[in-house]
Amino acid sequence: MVDNARAARMAKRIQTIVASAIEREIKDRRLEYITITDVTMTGDLHDATVFYTVRGENVGDEPDLEAAAEALHRARGQLRKIVGEQLGVRFTPTLTYRVDTVPEASAHMEALLERARQRDAELAKLKENAVPAGDPNPYKSDTREEDEA
């Protein structure tokens, strides 16, 4: 039987443990710029997927995704041991690491929304000077014409 609430609690706890272990216990310079963004658990609580993002050393620098992935791969045993010790469950879940693509997707979505806003502003400018083709209100009827007919 799947207990989604327990899986969610365990995922949140694993996220906290892994993030603090990377920050405080694992001494690898390639892990300095990693942020753990989310953890998902399977229903049987045997597998956890850890999502992470990597930022560059400086604001304008490109992140080194391969080095970060290699560092996480090399530290996976130590991280699993730390998670097992701090989690206190019978079976320590297997940890799989995946790059989180949500920031890139949201940046792309923001760019699309900005483009739509610019087009709306252009249309609003065109609409200000627009004149209807024909009568200003084609549905308005002149009552005098109807009375004479």
From Swiss-Prot:
Subcellular localization: Cytoplasm
Main location (coarse class): cytoplasm
Subunit-structure text: Monomer. Binds 30S ribosomal subunits, but not 50S ribosomal subunits or 70S ribosomes.
Role played: One of several proteins that assist in the late maturation steps of the functional core of the 30S ribosomal subunit. Associates with free 30S ribosomal subunits (but not with 30S subunits that are part of 70S ribosomes or polysomes). Required for efficient processing of 16S rRNA. May interact with the 5'-terminal helix region of 16S rRNA.
A Gene Ontology biological process term: maturation of SSU-rRNA
Family, per entry: Belongs to the RbfA family.
Natural source organism: Corynebacterium efficiens (strain DSM 44549 / YS-314 / AJ 12310 / JCM 11189 / NBRC 100395)
Gene name of the encoded protein: rbfA
Protein name: Ribosome-binding factor A
Keywords: Cytoplasm, Ribosome biogenesis
Highest taxon, organism lineage: Bacteria
Gene Ontology MF terms: ribosomal small subunit binding
Region feature (Disordered): 125-149
Pfam (any one): RBFA
Keyword Transmembrane helix: no
